[in-house]
Amino acid sequence: MDNFNNPTPQNALSPEEERIRQEKINALNKRLLREEKERKNGWKGIFWTVIAALAIRSLIFEPYNIPSSSMVPTLLVGDYLFVTKFDYGYSRYSFPLSLPIIPRGRIFYNEPKRGDVAVFKKPPENKTDYVKRIIGMPGDTIQMRGGRLYINDQIVPREFKGQELWNTELGEQLYTRYTETLPNGLVHDIYELTDENKYDDTPKIEIPPDSFFMMGDNRDNSLDSREFGPVPAKNLEGKSRLIFYSTDGNGWFFQFWRWKEFLRLERFFTDIK
């Protein structure tokens, strides 16, 4: 009986070739594992970056921009602000989309001061961000008589500063500028068109507990507590602290050769008072 040996396949690899092939496979597997790990780490990095950004915006400070002239001359259309979120504590309106992380009231609450320029959700729908000055505190009575502000039946003194032409969303208007002194001594400027506008004569309004009366410094071009009433403390989002950027809207930031034309450089990094 004849003996036959199993023939070696013609395409069989030599031991050296097999070793090289295995090294290539191992190297490929290692590269794929490394790329998968880097991809996962990349997504983790993005996730934690987003979380950190949301935490900063919710708990520390948040940028806002001014779309209307209701706070002229203090804030101008095109101003960009840093608003600190910790001054008054936190409520659901401190968080993006007003998520009910804090379902009721505020935590770590510190009462605002009269004269603060605050950002809040406009009642009663509590959806739109407004920025106004805090004029009335809890327990105060507020009234406008003939264009003059009365707090607790005492007229708030104001000093004439002059007249100025100002371009607003309503066109060019001649404003009278006054310096107003609030009962706590805070001094700020206001604009008036006339003392005979819609909100220049109002009934007395008593401010409930944990609520505040908000008014724009542009007294005849501001939708504020004279229209929608006192603002609950829970609606407060933060205190306006600093203007970090300001533009008149007639150019783009990358047009550096035109910066002097449309950037209000003198307003950069100025405190809000």
Predicted regions and their residues:
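Soluble "head" domains of membrane/secretory-pathway proteins
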Residues: 2-43, 64, 73-273
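Aromatic-capped interface at the extracytoplasmic side
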Residues: 57-71
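Hydrophobic membrane-insertion alpha-helices, especially the h-region
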Residues: 44-61
